[in-house]
Amino acid sequence: IPIAAGAALSARVRGTDQVAVSFFGDGATNEGVFHETLNMASLWKLPALFVIENNQYALSMRVVESSAQPNLAARAAAYAIPGEQVDGNNVVAVYRAAAAAVARARRGEGPTVLECITYRMRGHARFEAAGYRPAEEVERWKQLDPILRLGEALQAGGLATGGELEQI
């Protein structure tokens, strides 16, 4: 997270139109470095996008059990930064929100926090059993698979056929 702020500062000092993007999990928003970085990025109006991949669990603890404010994007307001929640399993929605945030940063308006609501289909680590997650919850999220949803949208919009998607 702080490395992205450093990259954003470098871009601003060099006068480029680059925007630094940092991707991190929901658990990282409970670390001091998240808050320190947002504060400095806001003060310096850095061209940065901070993307929270809210997959519902920090290790094996649900967000609602570890965060008094489960809307993690709302934390950005404390630093005068726009924060937005988006369906992280909707490729088009994520693209639109990220594009707007990048455009904002390029206009010199500073950073944005984008919280992508998604789900981790496996345990946190390869060796971890994910038995702490209810089976119904896992099944519900399987229905929201972003690859399948994008494929359906492409077909519905006449942009691709099922056969073309199979080849991909």
Place the predicted regions along the sequence by residue.
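Glycine-rich ThDP/TPP pyrophosphate-binding loop and its adjacent helix/strand module
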Residues: 1-168
